[in-house]
Amino acid sequence: MAVVTMRELLESGVHFGHQTRRWNPKMKRFIFTERNGIYIIDLLQSLSYIDRAYEFVKETVAHGGSIMFVGTKKQAQEAIAEQATRVGMPYVNQRWLGGMLTNFSTVYKRLQRLKELELIDFEDVAASGLTKKELLVLSREKAKLEKTLGGIREMQKVPSAVWIVDTKKEHIAVGEARKLHIPVVAILDTNCDPDEVDYKIPGNDDAIRSVTLLTRVIADAVAEGLIARSGAATGDSKPGEKAAGEPLAEWERDLLEGDKKDETAAAAEVQTSAETEKVADAEKPAEAVAEAEAEAPAADADAEQA
């Protein structure tokens, strides 16, 4: 079954590129035609590239990796936060801080600082042992850290790969990922440079519906990878598959527990029906013996009368 259909891509406007005067010649091979001064992206190529990116993300997560979702433009902020939160992955949908990947040790210290500030009760001035002014300063510091680092609060190390919406706007993130040899999965509009991206998806990175659809596809790949990872951890996987390296998201645990309950109920039902059949089979010979014994005296009485 296809990850996404051609109809969904068309309805979301994934095929619309930029104006013909705003393009990168390296994207020529992904362009189908031009209409009214707008480039039209070849969706047949997009479909094959989506499948390739989907498999990469799924395998990366299944082997214990993590995917960072990055998109700070207004059209992408909501979709990035929603889909990354759904699958329990880190995300950046506000300003990208320089060094977020290449200088992660310093960023990690700021994350620890954020967690310290979250322990303070800003409503109870007396119990905090601080003045109102000091609490106000700390409250502002906490709000600033939450805005810039809230999406990566639980991140313990640099991600295994990054999903990026608009590589031109997020050129700093792309540069840091390439410097650390972290694979980049991204939407490529007609004004982007395909050489910067490892797993490219030719498409529209400006329309909200297009960005939402493609980000959801990547999140679905993450979800499938998490399920495969949990199967490896419980020993249900095929030989050669890697075990889980990171905890599952809460929604994944609920899903798996529900599946296990269904399997247990089905097994119990099969066992009960098998036991019922055995009892029935055991009762049949006993009934036959009883009938034979009842018929024997009747036959003897008939013989005596004769």
Curated annotation (Swiss-Prot):
Regions of compositional bias (Low complexity) in chain numbering: 287-300
List the HAMAP family hit by this protein, alphabetically. Answer: Ribosomal_uS2_B
**Pfam families per record:** Ribosomal_S2
Q: Does the keyword ATP-binding apply?
A: no
Similarity-based family: Belongs to the universal ribosomal protein uS2 family.
NCBIfam families registered for this protein in UniProt: rpsB_bact (TIGR01011)
Source organism of this protein record: Streptomyces griseus subsp. griseus (strain JCM 4626 / CBS 651.72 / NBRC 13350 / KCC S-0626 / ISP 5235)
Biased composition, class Basic and acidic residues, residue ranges? 275-286
Q: Which UniProt keywords apply?
A: Ribonucleoprotein, Ribosomal protein
GO function terms (MF aspect):
structural constituent of ribosome
Record protein name field = Small ribosomal subunit protein uS2
Q: What stretch or stretches form a coiled coil here?
A: none
> Can you quote a single GO CC term?
cytosolic small ribosomal subunit
Region (Disordered) residue ranges read 257-306
Which GO BP terms sit in this record? translation
InterPro entries (alphabetical): Ribosomal_uS2 (IPR001865), Ribosomal_uS2_bac/mit/plastid (IPR005706), Ribosomal_uS2_CS (IPR018130), Ribosomal_uS2_flav_dom_sf (IPR023591)
Q: Which domain of life is it from?
A: Bacteria
